[in-house]
């Protein structure tokens, strides 16, 4: 199977967001995105409690309050782009801090590039498609205002270029490119079309004007899912199927955060990592999962795009942690919870900033406090006390009382990173984690 560019490149040691942009995004989300927020009931583990994480199932729960907020969002967006006759400053009122013109809600044409199909029912593209659907609902857009380009191989520059050309030809003035390997072509098109807004998912390139990148603090949810796994395991061997090895900070940081969560509740447990060297390889993901289970792992987690670790776990009578979307639908007898993205939070905020002239060209790196990431409902398969411990640590993260990568951290080769009283900065987390936590072991599986 051909490897995509996501396989070949790693994050450089650069900061993926600036604080001004992050703070502006945060304020928008708090005031305008109640319509995409949802309370999850952690019904398993003996207690019914509410944990304030997000659902990525479209636009979330429709309540009277969320509908009111949604209508206010639509009204604000429409009001933001005023007719010149209503403002003495004329066109200047419609120019945002990045020096670009705002786009009226009804004039938006949004293009999206997917590595998979918009009809996928789980996984990476599915999560992004739910986010786009949520954005459309939240802003009251029409379906014909969205152009989807599906199954675009991010290792095929010609295919990426063709998809972008088609979006431009169809009149798209906002484009989201959702996979790592789309980065270079997105940059080139942003330079060629300076009046079009481009946002690239993951990656690191941007120009501070019409080309930005977006990702999130998924490690926060990884940490919480480690608590779930650490309490569940009976063998004290927990498997982790990872797309990339230690040269990719996104994967390695997620593994480390997960392993720290495991250790918090079960210091005797080990996390065994099998690396597939591909983001999307169903056969390898299946084989790696089977190998980890054969080595005694009774809980699997994953940073790969398919449900293979979940299906392998269900077939073998073991348990698993899903990723990207709620995978319990496919494997209800195995999936304990899933680490998910609520991309509608980001997409809604971004497009709204384009409409209301507050877009400033900054990159985005949100987390739980922005309702970008979270966990799905904990299954009744979870151990007693899981929901209480997850909620406790989630609240500490949200209140700023705890950061995952705090203080001196011991790696699995006995060295240490970090400093007492300090937290690893964003540049290190996104581009500089090339070490594994002390309870992690990378294993051979083929």
Tell me what each language-model feature is.
Residues 23-32:
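Bacterial N-terminal signal peptides that target proteins for export
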Residues 48, 52-71, 75-446:
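A residue-level marker of the well-folded mature domains of exported/periplasmic proteins
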């Amino acid at each position: 199977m051909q490897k995509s560019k996501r396989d070949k490149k790693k994050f450089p040691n650069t900061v993926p967001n600036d604080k001004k942009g992050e703070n502006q995004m945060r304020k928008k989300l708090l005031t305008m995105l109640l319509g995409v927020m949802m309370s999850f009931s952690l019904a398993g583990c003996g207690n019914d409690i509410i944990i304030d994480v997000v659902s990525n199932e479209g636009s979330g729960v429709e309540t009277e309050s969320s509908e009111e907020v949604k209508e206010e969002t639509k009204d604000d967006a429409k009001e933001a782009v005023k007719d010149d006759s209503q403002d003495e400053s004329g066109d200047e009122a419609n120019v945002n801090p990045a020096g670009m013109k705002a786009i009226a809600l009804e004039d938006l044409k949004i293009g999206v590039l997917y590595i998979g199909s918009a009809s996928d029912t789980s996984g990476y593209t599915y999560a992004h498609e739910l986010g786009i659907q949520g954005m459309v609902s939240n802003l009251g857009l029409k379906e014909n205002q969205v152009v989807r380009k599906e199954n675009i191989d991010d290792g095929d520059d010609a295919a990426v270029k063709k998809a972008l050309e088609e979006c431009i030809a169809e009149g798209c003035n906002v484009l989201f490119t959702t996979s790592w390997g789309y980065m270079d072509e997105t940059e080139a098109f942003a330079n060629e079309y300076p009046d079009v807004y481009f946002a690239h998912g993951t990656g690191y390139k941007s120009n501070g004007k019409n080309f930005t990148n977006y990702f999130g603090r998924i490690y926060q949810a990884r940490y919480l899912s480690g608590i779930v796994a650490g309490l569940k395991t009976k063998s004290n061997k927990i498997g982790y199927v990872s797309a990339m090895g230690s040269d990719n900070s996104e994967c390695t940081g997620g593994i480390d955060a997960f392993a720290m969560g495991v250790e918090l509740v079960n210091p005797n447990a080990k996390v065994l990592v099998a690396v597939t060297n591909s983001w999307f390889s169903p056969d390898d993901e299946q084989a790696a999962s089977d190998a980890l289970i054969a080595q005694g792992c009774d809980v699997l987690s994953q940073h790969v795009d398919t449900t293979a670790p979940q299906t392998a776990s269900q077939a073998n009578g073991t348990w698993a942690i899903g990723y990207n979307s709620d995978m319990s639908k496919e494997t209800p007898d195995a999936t304990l919870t899933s680490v998910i993205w609520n991309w509608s939070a980001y997409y809604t905020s971004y497009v709204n900033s384009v409409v209301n002239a507050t877009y400033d060209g900054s990159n985005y790196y949100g987390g739980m406090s922005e309702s970008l990431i979270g966990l799905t409902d904990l299954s009744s398969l979870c151990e007693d006390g899981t929901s209480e411990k997850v909620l406790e640590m989630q609240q500490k993260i949200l209140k700023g009382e705890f950061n995952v990568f705090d203080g001196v951290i011991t790696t699995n080769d006995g060295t240490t990173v970090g400093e007492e009283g300090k937290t690893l900065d964003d540049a290190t987390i996104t581009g500089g984690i090339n070490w594994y936590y002390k309870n992690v072991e990378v294993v051979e599986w083929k």
